[in-house]
From Swiss-Prot:
Its EC number is 6.3.5.-. The gene is gatB. This is Aspartyl/glutamyl-tRNA(Asn/Gln) amidotransferase subunit B. Allows the formation of correctly charged Asn-tRNA(Asn) or Gln-tRNA(Gln) through the transamidation of misacylated Asp-tRNA(Asn) or Glu-tRNA(Gln) in organisms which lack either or both of asparaginyl-tRNA or glutaminyl-tRNA synthetases. The reaction takes place in the presence of glutamine and ATP through an activated phospho-Asp-tRNA(Asn) or phospho-Glu-tRNA(Gln). PROSITE patterns: GATB.
Length: 495
């Protein structure tokens, strides 16, 4: 199937990624670990832009940028240099931002995503290094704020800005690109996406192959999808009414789900770029071979290996490699002798499904425990041991607990305030599989109490059988094996 794109939608993204796994800022020795710090405590004369200070380049930031470029299959520049981007804004104490202009460190890369009609390649125009500005805290909403506070803790944190080609044709494709891109960055261990402000996106969008509009500074993948859905609808409505779409910059109000005009093309600033005189150009071709050797197995390669090595489905492999910590957790479970296909089902379908239902995000894996935190409330967090998942899967595989009981154990482990093993939870909740005579008794009672459903099933209504199985599971408090109960009911009613 070929995706027709009837509305002529073109989407390109500019993604600002904090290299927040680095310990120090881009041009000074201040810590990048500022998220729980008091405002303006992770600063120094350099990142505050005080007169007489000179920047000192963080070599590890350059190495991280090269890693990102290699992972994106991009061209790494033989020589690169920094420029000054001149503009006045309160979050930029120097009056200019140190960035890269016409000599980016990476160009001509690509990311392959699942598009509307199969695999789809999104081109990477460039990726360049720069420093993050400070953070403005608006008192109240951004439109009605009567005052602004400035926190310079973020000022100078290393950034990579990645610019894509306008190759995405729907908001869904844009979100899939961001999910894939974030996954690659986390595999490289240069980026923690769970931290506030770690990834900020500017989205450029046009319809009917027309005028481009930029939506600035969107902070989440879901927000990007929502902003694009609204903006595409707005532009189509303008054209439908006989108007023309203006080339402008807009802001996305996430609370209201709308985009609002910030400035038109005529108001756009000239940044007067010129070469940063305090930093020499860099020749980095000699760094590339050694950095290439440090690249980890990336998501697509790991996914292919999981399918071949463990014999699991492509769908399970995609889910399990969507987070490197989840992939490592799964491999730890398999390494302890668990059937990889059963482990994939319980990890990708049940465990990950329960995390998503609770709005929990995987945050860590130390080789023993996988940790997770609430997406909106970092104070809500917990962890599960790989050894506990192994124990649970083995109990299920040995037929000692039903699938429903196993799900109940996972839910309890996710919600529990104190750590307990699966066996302890099963014992406390009475979840060990019911004895055969108990199941037989429950089936007999169910048949006797539900004559209408019995007659419906005998008459050919298949869903009535599901109802009867549910009643048996209810009577046995989920300890019966649903498949066995189903077979016994059929045998009883149809011989």
């Amino acid at each position: 199937m070929v995706y027709e794109n009837p509305d002529g939608v073109r989407i390109g993204l500019e993604i600002h990624i904090q290299l927040n796994k680095l310990k120090t800022k881009m041009f000074c020795g201040c810590s990048t670990d500022y998220h729980n710090a008091a405002p303006n405590t992770h600063t120094c004369p350099i990142c505050l832009g005080l007169p007489g200070t000179l920047p000192v380049l963080n070599k590890k930031a350059v190495e991280a940028a090269i890693k990102v470029g290699l992972a994106l299959e991009g061209e790494i520049a033989e020589e690169t240099q920094f420029h000054r981007k001149n503009y006045f804004y309160p979050d930029l104490p120097k009056g200019f931002q140190i960035t890269q202009y016409d000599f980016p460190i990476v160009s001509n890369g690509k990311v392959v995503i699942e598009g509307e009609d199969g695999e789809h390649t999104v081109g990477i125009t460039r990726a360049h290094m720069e420093e993050d500005p400070g953070k403005l805290v608006h008192i109240g909403s951004i439109e009605k704020s009567k005052g602004v506070l400035i926190d310079y803790n973020r000022s100078g944190v290393p950034l990579i800005e990645t610019v894509t080609e306008p190759d995405m044709r729907s908001p869904k494709e844009a979100r899939r690109f961001l999910d894939k891109f974030r996954n690659i960055l986390e595999y490289l261990d240069v980026f923690d996406g769970n931290l506030e402000g770690a990834m900020r996106v500017d989205a450029n969008v046009s319809v009917h192959w027309g005028t481009r509009v930029e939506v600035k500074n969107i902070s989440s993948h879901k927000g990007v999808e929502k902003a694009l859905l609204y903006e595409i609808m707005r532009q189509k409505n303008v054209i439908r009414r006989g108007g023309k779409v203006s080339q402008e910059t807009r802001h996305f109000d996430e609370g209201r789900g709308v985009t609002l005009s910030m400035r038109t093309k005529e108001e756009a600033e000239d940044y007067r770029y010129f070469r940063e005189p305090d930093l020499m150009p860099m020749r980095i071709t000699g760094w590339i071979p050694s950095i290439k050797k440090t690249l980890p197995e990336l998501p697509d390669a790991k996914r292919a290996r999981f399918i071949e090595q463990y014999g699991i489905t492509d769908m399970h492999a995609k889910s399990l490699t969507s987070k490197i910590m989840l992939a490592d957790f799964y491999e730890s479970v398999c390494a302890k002798g668990v059937d990889p296909k059963i482990a994939a089902t319980w990890t990708a379908d049940v465990f990950l499904g329960e995390l998503n239902y609770r709005d929990l995000e995987i945050s860590s894996y130390d080789g023993k425990k996988i940790g997770f935190i609430h997406a909106k409330d970092p104070g809500i967090k917990n962890s599960i041991k790989a050894s506990d998942m192994v124990e649970l899967i083995n109990l299920f595989a040995e037929g000692k607990i039903s699938d429903r009981a196993a799900v109940e154990v996972i839910r309890t482990m996710l919600d529990a305030a104190e750590e307990k093993t699966p066996s302890q939870i099963i014992e406390e909740k009475g979840l060990f599989k019911a004895e055969d005579d108990l199941v037989t008794k429950a089936i007999a009672e169910t048949i006797a109490e539900n004559e209408a459903a019995v007659q419906d099933y005998i008459g050919g209504t298949e869903k009535s059988l599901n109802f009867l199985v549910g009643q048996v599971m209810k009577k046995t408090k989920g300890t019966a094996d649903a498949k066995t109960a189903r077979e016994l009911i059929i045998k009883e009613l149809k011989g």
